[in-house]
A protein has these predicted regions:
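Bacterial Sec-dependent N-terminal signal peptides
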Residues: 1-32
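Function-determining sites in protein domains
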Residues: 29-179
Length: 179
């Protein structure tokens, strides 16, 4: 009963990822991912937010990402997707928070998890795309994400087992930062 809805959601997520990945050069912003500081380096409320929200978003995901994506919108619930191989099966797993974590009281946010089995070729293709994107993480201009919009986080693990993570900020349409 839920399989068609899950597949439709997963297809939308994959399509958005591919579109976002290939549109980096088309945007008037930087065309590479920026490095991500370790979440443990943030202090105070922001540090607590990052550690808590990523802990929730990674619920049920493998410790080391093959290909993982997380989105942190300013005013709507955070969500993540992981491409994984478990028990010989290839799956896309998505986690969506029940509400925006930043505005919620502690302990009130739950995780809605959905998963779908994918083909080995899609698994390998998504892994290749994520590795290509995360290998190009640069900090050339020291720019940083703004306050409004969505920050997208991409992570993957290379053949040597090294985890790479980068982020891309996408300002809200119609704002001065988007122009």
């Amino acid at each position: 009963r839920y399989v068609p809805k899950i597949r439709q959601l997963m297809k939308k997520i994959v399509f958005c990822l591919l579109l976002l990945t290939f549109s980096f050069r088309l945007a008037a912003q930087i065309d590479y991912l920026e490095p991500v500081k370790p979440f443990s380096s943030y202090t105070g409320e922001l540090g607590e937010y990052y550690r808590s929200v990523f802990s929730l978003l990674n619920t049920g995901f493998q410790k080391q990402p093959y290909a993982r994506f997380a989105a942190i919108p300013s005013f709507s619930p955070e969500y993540a997707m992981s491409v994984e191989r478990k028990n010989g099966r290839y799956t896309l797993i998505s986690n969506t928070l029940s509400r925006t974590y930043w505005q919620a009281e502690k302990g009130t946010v739950t995780v809605d998890t959905k998963s779908v089995v994918i083909s080995a070729s899609l698994y390998q293709s998504l892994g290749a795309i994520f590795r290509l994107v995360t290998e190009q993480v640069q900090d050339l201009d020291g720019s940083t994400a703004g306050l409004d919009g969505i920050v997208y986080y991409f992570s993957s693990t290379d053949a040597k087992g090294k985890e790479r993570m980068g982020r891309k900020w996408s300002p809200e349409k119609g704002t001065l930062m988007e122009r």
